[in-house]
Amino acid sequence: MPRKGPIPRREVLPDPVYNSRLAARFVNRMMVDGKKGAAEKIFYKSLEVLQEKTGEDAIKAFEKAVDNVKPFVEVKSRRVGGATYQVPVEVRSDRQVSLAIRWLITYARARGEKGMVGRLSGELLDAFNNRGGAVKKKDDTHRMAEANKAFAHFRW
């Protein structure tokens, strides 16, 4: 196995409309089959709807929605002497953002509204108001970590 050290992370360029790296990461994650234009259209229309419904600046509302979904702790499986324990560990800040984006998109796609714009804006609005599938997922993750606090000494 070659020993070249860690692979350097590629910087994501900020998106053209809001000049936000978070928005660019969200669009890239939402993209299917390389169709970035379609993903951008859906994202920007969703932010317009979000701005109408919240009355706040679109990008600020989006950032607040992502912040409300970020998990601070998660559990990782750790095998100790034949038993597997769910060990709570803190989540790195870049992983917090990645998980929040992933959960928002997953739960937006699973919603019942017609069209992805309606689904995404609905999920972002719910996340903005601290409810919805993605926020529930974060709460479940925190609950799992809290329940397995006794195994925290197995951290590595």
Swiss-Prot record:
Membrane-spanning segments: none
GO cellular component terms, semicolon-separated: small ribosomal subunit
MF annotations from Gene Ontology: rRNA binding; structural constituent of ribosome; tRNA binding
Pfam short name (any one): Ribosomal_S7
Source organism superkingdom: Bacteria
A single BP term in Gene Ontology: translation
Keyword line: Ribonucleoprotein, Ribosomal protein, RNA-binding, rRNA-binding, tRNA-binding
Functional description taken from the UniProt entry: One of the primary rRNA binding proteins, it binds directly to 16S rRNA where it nucleates assembly of the head domain of the 30S subunit. Is located at the subunit interface close to the decoding center, probably blocks exit of the E-site tRNA.
Family label: Belongs to the universal ribosomal protein uS7 family.
UniProt subunit comment: Part of the 30S ribosomal subunit. Contacts proteins S9 and S11.
NCBIfam families recorded: rpsG_bact
Protein name, per record: Small ribosomal subunit protein uS7
Species, as recorded: Oleidesulfovibrio alaskensis (strain ATCC BAA-1058 / DSM 17464 / G20) (Desulfovibrio alaskensis)
